[in-house]
């Protein structure tokens, strides 16, 4: 049986933090605010996987009220979700995702992001797709207040 899940996340920019997207540190003057490393792309992918599995969302599985997850790499959380998939004998068919930001442009980093995400999930990088989009200056992303990400995941049992 095939199952699909959709994920979404958003974080706002702040001074004094690193910008991490898809597990990759991207040179930029601001980072994203969050309890963990605030990796919106990985968070959206985690939520999509959990949704396809019929599980709770990322906030319930890894609550921001827990000190265990303070500043944690989202790739560590993704590996935990990969273990859940394995326990349920489910496999990822593919992931399609979109990062929405006016700046920075992510295209120079997408191959590295794909590889890191695929490694965590024990799948091929060809099963992971990452696109970058702007909002042509519209909305909070267009005003460079933050970044959002969307992900769709297809899994099979």
From Swiss-Prot:
Known pathway: Isoprenoid biosynthesis; isopentenyl diphosphate biosynthesis via DXP pathway; isopentenyl diphosphate from 1-deoxy-D-xylulose 5-phosphate: step 4/6
Domain of life per record: Bacteria
CDD domains for this protein: MECDP_synthase (cd00554)
Alphabetical list of Gene3D superfamilies matching this protein: 2-C-methyl-D-erythritol 2,4-cyclodiphosphate synthase
GO biological process: isopentenyl diphosphate biosynthetic process, methylerythritol 4-phosphate pathway; terpenoid biosynthetic process
Listed InterPro entries: MECDP_synthase, MECDP_synthase_CS, MECDP_synthase_sf
EC number: 4.6.1.12
Cofactor remark from the record: Binds 1 divalent metal cation per subunit.
Enzyme class: lyase
Site label Transition state stabilizer, positions: 35, 134
Keyword Magnesium: no
Keyword terms of this UniProt record: Isoprene biosynthesis, Lyase, Metal-binding
Listed PROSITE patterns: ISPF
Short name of any one Pfam family annotated for the protein: YgbB
Assembly behavior: Homotrimer.
Function recorded in the entry: Involved in the biosynthesis of isopentenyl diphosphate (IPP) and dimethylallyl diphosphate (DMAPP), two major building blocks of isoprenoid compounds. Catalyzes the conversion of 4-diphosphocytidyl-2-C-methyl-D-erythritol 2-phosphate (CDP-ME2P) to 2-C-methyl-D-erythritol 2,4-cyclodiphosphate (ME-CPP) with a corresponding release of cytidine 5-monophosphate (CMP).
Similarity-based family: Belongs to the IspF family.
HAMAP family documented for this protein: IspF
Name this protein carries in UniProt: 2-C-methyl-D-erythritol 2,4-cyclodiphosphate synthase
């Amino acid at each position: 049986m095939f199952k699909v899940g959709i994920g979404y996340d958003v974080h706002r920019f702040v001074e004094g933090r690193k910008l991490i997207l898809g597990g990759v540190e991207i040179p930029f003057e601001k980072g994203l605010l969050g309890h963990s490393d605030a990796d919106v792309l990985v968070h959206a992918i985690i939520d999509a996987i959990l949704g396809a599995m019929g599980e709770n969302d990322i906030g319930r599985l890894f609550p921001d009220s827990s000190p265990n997850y303070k500043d944690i790499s989202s790739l560590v959380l993704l590996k935990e979700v990969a273990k859940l998939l394995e326990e349920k004998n489910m496999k990822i068919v593919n992931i399609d995702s979109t990062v929405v930001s006016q700046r920075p442009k992510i295209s120079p980093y997408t191959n590295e992001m794909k590889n890191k995400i695929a490694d965590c999930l024990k799948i091929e990088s060809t099963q992971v797709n990452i696109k970058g989009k702007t909002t042509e200056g519209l909305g909070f992303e267009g005003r460079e207040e933050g970044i959002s990400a969307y992900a769709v995941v297809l899994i099979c049992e």
